[in-house]
């Protein structure tokens, strides 16, 4: 598929896995989410960038998608701040295009699955296609170390949580601290012995990009802390915990990315509307002893939460911090704190 479009960002050529989000807002939060490393992000909404940009919407200190595609990218200031989104993307050096037939592109990805693609302001079609065909797939790639930040602390009271940063959003860090926990952030690749040497009351595993099965160092670290302190994971962290517990993951046809995904809790049947951003899912065709599925997607029946009560471990596939989005699952940060201090 070849789509004509108009450049409104930085010039250049960008390659990656083509994905789409159905979120109507939160465009600045989306492009600063490290989970989009290695991907070209398409917004399905007819217009983005219609309320400006501001530092309060940043989930990290940089833009992570290789390129941004939209039908229309606004450039007016707004309630978020005085700088328009189009100008902000250009200043960040991001390849961004508009006037693309995003409806056609999204339907193609929906019908044929995630695939490699590229955006270029400088190459011809055949040159770009040749580069796309040579570009590596995300499968088998551990991107957690590249997406992780440095060591840092947040919060000065409450139980101490060691958060393993695989590409953690600022909103998740704020959610942990806001629930009354002192958070010590360490990068992906930190060993179990190094984590336990910090004397944590609990361990958290963050979201992030790449193939969870390839994140062997984090999986090994989790295996070394399970049963010693309470463990909680979100998104990629949910998938990595699942691997440490003996489950496996598989690639979804086109992923879950949006702010209106219904998830049902097994314990009481309550449905939560959730924010999601993932391209892999946990496979629960053979549950190890002591592991249970706690939440399920009402869109496709995929696993959205697991727990191993005897090992003090639990995780969810979706984002309870929801920046922006519904806060149906915000209680999960407090629930983790309650488990830690119990």
Residue ranges and their predicted role:
Residues 157-160, 228, 290:
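Phosphate-coordination loops involved in phosphoryl transfer and adenosine-cofactor binding
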Residues 269-311:
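Catalytic beta-strand/loop cores that center a nucleophilic Ser/Cys/Thr
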Residues 1-189, 193, 197-198, 212, ...:
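RNA-binding accessory domains that recognize and position tRNA/RNA substrates
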Residues 95, 160, 230-232, 248, ...:
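Proline-centered loop/turn at the N-terminus of a beta-strand
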Residues 160-165, 274-275, 314-318:
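Active-site-proximal beta-strand elements of phosphoester/diester hydrolases
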Residues 305-341:
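A glycine-centered loop/beta-turn motif at secondary-structure junctions
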Residues 197, 201-202, 207-281, 325-340:
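Cysteine-nucleophile active-site neighborhood
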């Amino acid at each position: 598929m070849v789509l004509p479009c108009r450049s409104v960002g930085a010039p250049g050529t960008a390659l990656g896995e083509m994905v789409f989000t159905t979120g109507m807002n939160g465009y600045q939060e989306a492009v600063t989410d490290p989970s989009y490393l290695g991907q070209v992000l398409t917004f399905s909404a007819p217009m983005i960038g219609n309320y400006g940009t501001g530092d309060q919407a940043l989930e990290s200190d940089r833009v992570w998608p290789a390129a941004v595609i939209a039908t229309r990218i606004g450039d007016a200031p707004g309630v978020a701040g005085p700088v328009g989104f189009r100008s902000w993307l250009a200043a960040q050096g991001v390849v961004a295009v508009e006037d693309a037939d995003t409806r056609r592109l999204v339907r193609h990805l929906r019908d044929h699955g995630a695939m490699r693609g590229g955006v270029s302001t400088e190459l011809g079609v055949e040159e770009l296609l040749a580069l796309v065909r040579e570009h590596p797939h995300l499968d088998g790639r551990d991107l957690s170390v590249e997406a992780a930040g440095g060591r840092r602390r947040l919060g000065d009271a409450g139980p101490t949580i060691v958060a393993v940063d695989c590409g953690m959003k600022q909103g998740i860090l704020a959610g942990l601290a806001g629930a009354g926990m002192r958070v010590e952030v360490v990068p992906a690749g930190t060993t179990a012995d190094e984590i336990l040497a910090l004397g944590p009351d609990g361990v958290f595993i963050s979201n992030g990009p790449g193939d969870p099965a390839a994140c062997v160092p984090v999986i090994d670290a989790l295996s070394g802390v399970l049963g010693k302190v309470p463990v909680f994971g979100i998104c990629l962290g949910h998938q990595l915990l699942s691997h440490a517990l003996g489950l496996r993951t598989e690639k979804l046809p086109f992923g879950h990315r949006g702010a209106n995904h219904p998830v049902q809790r097994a314990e009481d049947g309550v449905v939560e509307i959730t924010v999601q951003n993932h391209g892999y899912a946990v496979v629960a065709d053979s549950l190890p002893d002591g592991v249970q599925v706690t939440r399920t997607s009402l869109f496709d029946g995929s696993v959205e939460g697991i727990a191993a009560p005897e090992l003090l471990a639990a995780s969810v596939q979706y984002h309870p911090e929801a920046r922006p989005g519904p806060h149906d699952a915000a209680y999960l940060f407090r629930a983790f704190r309650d488990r830690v201090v119990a």
